[in-house]
Amino acid sequence: QAQLVRFRTTVGVSFGVARQNPAARLVFLLRSGNRVIVNENVFQADVANDSRLSSVVSFARMEELPLATQAALIYDARAIAGVHGQGLTWTAFLPAADDRPCACLEIHPEGCSHSCKSDYRDLSAMNKVQYNRLVQPLANNCIAKYAASWRMCGNITVNSEQVRDKLAQMVALVTPRQ
């Protein structure tokens, strides 16, 4: 982990975003194209109305942001969540330490659990980040077109309550005790 911490620190300094003790913020990664949350608007509204999450969760489409802005979001957070995909690589940049827990939630499209690689679980372990995983059902627009193949579509319909409960557990973990 020491090499990863040095790398994370160097990148943070390069972008001018290195934080010593970021807030208990959670960045939820949204996607465009494949593996989107089809009920994203409802889910975001539910998070906004959830007193456990509304003040700490921010949503971002990383592919629409400059790299420095992406780095600033993550360096100012303690947790990251999203549907399986390369945006979760930012898990390596969460400022985890023995006295500063961080967390990652990887949402797998149904059918992905056995064939999805363990990259983000392994990356979390290397960075001492608590790894969490949820499986969510493929959206109807995938099932009709691709016979339930997450590789061809991968769009999901999230169970808002289930995902929000997991996010709340993560926020509780990363929130400093008073």
Q: What is each model feature region?
A:
Residues 1-178:
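The feature primarily captures lumenal catalytic ectodomains
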